[in-house]
Every structure is written in C-alpha cells, then in structure tokens.
Swiss-Prot record:
Organism: Rhodospirillum rubrum (strain ATCC 11170 / ATH 1.1.1 / DSM 467 / LMG 4362 / NCIMB 8255 / S1)
Pfam families: Ribosom_S12_S23
Protein name from the UniProt record: Small ribosomal subunit protein uS12
Similarity field: Belongs to the universal ribosomal protein uS12 family.
Compositional bias annotation for Basic residues: 110-123
Gene Ontology CC entries for this record: small ribosomal subunit
This protein's record includes keyword Ribosomal protein: yes
Annotated positions of the 3-methylthioaspartic acid modification: D89
HAMAP family referenced in this protein's UniProt entry, alphabetically: Ribosomal_uS12_B
Keyword Protein transport: no
Domain of life of the native organism: Bacteria
Region (Disordered): 104-123
Alphabetical UniProt keywords: Methylation, Ribonucleoprotein, Ribosomal protein, RNA-binding, rRNA-binding, tRNA-binding
BP terms from Gene Ontology: translation
Length: 123
C-alpha cells in the first residue's frame, strides 16, 4: 500500500471503461445493409455453422452481426436492424440482427420465446 506522500506525487489512475458496442453510438438499435451473408465456425469446444452477416450501418461502421434462430431469408443488400449483444463463441461478433423487422422475416413455426424471434402467435 502506498504512503500518503507517494499518492501525492503520483495519484491513482482511474480505470477507463471501454465500450463493448462502439458502432451503436449510444443508440438501442441501428439500421444497416447486409454486404455479405455467410457461415462461420465457433471457438474450440463447440462445433457448428453459425449464420452471420457483415452489415454496413447508417453511421458508416461495418460490423459483423449474428442471425439468430433457425433459417433466415437474408441476402446481400437486405436492410436489417441490429442491436448490441455478443455471441460468446464467435470472436468479433458483437451485434445481433433483430428478427421480424425491416427485410428480416421472423422464425417460422416458433412457439416459445416468439417475441425474441419476431414470430406471430400461432393459430
């Protein structure tokens, strides 16, 4: 532990909190256009083909965002809405595409947690 004199000579440094979703610029959602839609493989213990899209946002940022749910209709030039939220086993994927908004359709035949996947109530 430093002495009072040491603290006077060199004060304590405040820890700088880094922004986890810089492209959002303090907005809850952002609109963008898909520039590339592809699959990628997750980190070590997991194995799958995760669906992701490269999105050019309205503020000029280009980010990689995850497409949640089973099946999607996205292709190049699709207009999408993204939100923050990383995918733990995909390095560099820090955003999610919102299903059921703009050009993104909701997940078909979804019965539980429908609001998260933009699915209408089944009849």
């Amino acid at each position: 532990m430093p002495t009072i004199n040491q603290l006077i000579r060199k004060p304590r440094k405040a820890v700088v909190k880094r922004n986890k979703v810089p492209a959002m610029q303090a907005c809850p959602q952002k609109r963008g256009v898909c520039t590339r839609v592809y699959t990628t493989t997750p980190k070590k213990p997991n194995s799958a083909l995760r669906k992701v899209a490269r999105v050019r946002l309205t503020n000029g940022f280009e980010v990689t965002s995850y497409i949640p749910g089973e099946g999607h209709n996205l292709q190049e030039h699709s207009v999408v809405m993204i939100r923050g939220g990383r995918v733990k086993d995909l390095p560099g994927v820090r955003y999610h595409i919102i299903r059921g908004v703009l050009d993104t359709q909701g997940v078909k035949d979804r019965r539980q947690r429908r609001s998260k996947y933009g699915a209408k109530r089944p009849k």
